[in-house]
């Protein structure tokens, strides 16, 4: 009898059949905001090293004591071992995060080598990340506890293992949190990204890189559905600005150093083992506790809509991107030819309004929500998202298969199990 973890983690982690008959590579061209973005990049790097110097110093002292040594190297090598013909060896950053844990398990399930990296920060309850790490460990995946800005740690990992690929999912997430702690976004999403790229460019051989951008880069764009070629020069939040800056930075490293890089613009990912700061997660918690939930509305009381994308579909897109990533062409920091640079949307293509999402949660929780409708504040949120996924479909056969009704049913089942609710008992009304 399969466990609930087996049932709720991705069940289709195999390679995609890649249709190359209509292959398209999507280049990131300079927009009218290029000067602004480079200015943001330079200011951000300066701010990160000034504002976070004490943080990095103290963090480095802690990390120095938590990695290294013969036993540690053995664990890293063992976890990175490939167990299938034609397999890959992947460093997954943010491995105990929501998407990172699912991707790591899917890679391991099909026989790839996987080593995780995570700093276990307290943006949300670290106990959930540690529970994910326990699950990864039970599948033979070793997760290194360390910070993306620790260059010595990253260099050591690449010294121990010649990774063929990097799946970069570590980032400071969330739109509203940027109003409270903007420096954390610079530290993780810009300085951390540059640090990782510096290590990858110097590696020999260089790995191919797939990394998580975000649908938030479309910002205030009103054209729908969003396509990769649409304008992305109107960020609505600092989070979006750092992700757009990341796209410009990765393009530069591809151009100068020959790194094969694929950026993935995720659209509102949800599912089991998700992030507690996401609306569907907090709605579930508050509904079960009998607390009111806040539902934002746009101008003229228009309901907000999101292209909610189930985690299994995102995982399939991540693996398809890895399998079709191509090869980096540099060696020891020197470019020897052009390398692929691609950007893809990964969404569901079927936007659903937030009130309908709440309707579905009520159905599966068997509890009515106490709804409080308020006007959307100017805190970085956007009124709608809608993905055009034709590029990912043409390049590596990406095809989402889970609708919101089915996906939320799986999430609710996991939530009730993980947090110890007795579904046979009368829930709080």
Swiss-Prot record:
Inhibited by UDP-Xylose. It is a multi-pass membrane protein. In root stele, leaves, siliques, flowers, pollen and stems. The chain crosses the membrane at residues 36-56, 87-107. One of its GO terms (biological process) is galacturonate biosynthetic process. GO terms for molecular function: UDP-glucuronate 4-epimerase activity. Belongs to the NAD(P)-dependent epimerase/dehydratase family. Homodimer. This is UDP-glucuronate 4-epimerase 1. It comes from Arabidopsis thaliana (Mouse-ear cress). The lineage of its organism: Eukaryota, Viridiplantae, Streptophyta, Embryophyta, Tracheophyta. The gene is GAE1.
